[in-house]
Amino acid sequence: MTYFIIIISAIFVNNIVLSQFLGICPFLGVSKKISTGIGMTGAVTFVMVIATIVTYFIQEFILEKFGITYLQTISFILVIAALVQLVEIVLKKVSPPLYQALGVFLPLITTNCAILGVAIMTVSRDYNLIEAVIFSASSAVGFGLALITFAGIREQLDLVNVPKGMQGAPIALVVAGLLAMAFMGFAGLV
Amino acid sequence: MNQWKNFSKGFFKDNPVFVMLLGMCPTLGVTSSAINGLGMGLATTFVLVMSNIVVALVKDFIPEKVRIPSFIVIIASFVTVVEMVMQAYLPALFEALGLFIPLIVVNCLVLGRAEAFASKNTLGSSVVDGLGMGLGFSMALTMLGAVRELFGSGKIFGLSLFSESYGMLIFVLAPGAFIALGYLTAFINKVRKA
């Protein structure tokens, strides 16, 4: 039951993009087409789950054991940066088709605050390993849901006549606001 | 280079929030009130100036290939400093900003200035650039925070202007952040071009 609550909460109620404001840069940057949105979601899911598992072990067995939790920010971001590089190299070798699909998005992920944010949240909420995996995976699903829905709306938005001053970023932000309002309907679900 | 131009570009011409759309996560996440926006802006300014200084000083010693990880370590060190100082002296602000303080590390504005400016320019210009960009960022966050606070609860910096019961709660909540920033961006762009 706890797992179920974690999943629903991470995907809908506390959606990582629309209510936690993490990962806004890719949310606004790569949401012009649905296909790129799907690619980005795949890459984020992949890295987010692995990064959360690795940072979980680092927190548990290195930082807490030696009482150096103040090094959390530095160690986590370094691990994530190295991990992204590693994933890129491994994918290139092991699965060229997957690398083709996710490749361009991987370098962008180091500075995606959703990855670091989820890693820190996992630690600060004292999740165990299974909960951490479930939480990170469903956060990634929530990110994908928001990103792909938003990309779909923006594809439609290209066809309408937007007032001159609102073109580009302003109209995208207002649309994102309306989408966030729709997601607020899930509040109180868990 | 003209230092005044270098300083002032962060406010209007190349404002990090309204024009370059950098650092959107903290911009939207912490601006439920003007004071939170200002606090976040100043914390980011500190990190930005300090990392610009260090990057400008060590740029000749860092091999090209590992420059991004090195910049991230430099930035992360200053973020840790900010985190500890704030926790010790401003615990209320520390609580309010929460997760977004460690996330200054991945603020694309900070890394962006280190990579695009400080790694190519002299120490003096880098300090001025960091100050200008940081204060421009603070200005944008404070403006957004003030707008949301005013419409949401009828206050600015905690000073009550009209009764809270007339406030529109939506501006304090998540959707209001996007909508307020959207209209504010449109407004600033209009002013900038005029």
Which sequence ranges carry the predicted segments?
Chain A
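Interfacial loop-to-transmembrane junctions
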Residues: E155-L173
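Ordered, amphipathic secondary-structure segments that act as subunit-interaction surfaces
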Residues: E60-G103
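Cytoplasmic-side transmembrane-helix entry/capping segments in multi-pass membrane proteins
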Residues: S35-F46, Y70-F76, L98-T110, G165-I171
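Structural signature of hydrophobic alpha-helical transmembrane segments
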Residues: Y3-L18, F66-A82, V133-A146
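C-terminal ends of transmembrane helices
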Residues: L22-T36, V84-L98, F150-N161
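Hydrophobic core segments of alpha-helical transmembrane domains in multi-pass membrane transport
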Residues: I6, V13, V44, V49-I53, ...
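Helix-coil boundary and interhelical linker segments in multi-pass alpha-helical membrane proteins
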Residues: M1-I5, F57-Y70, I120-E131, A187-V190
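Generic transmembrane alpha-helix signature in multi-pass membrane proteins
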Residues: F21-G29, E88-K93, V104-L106, C113-D126
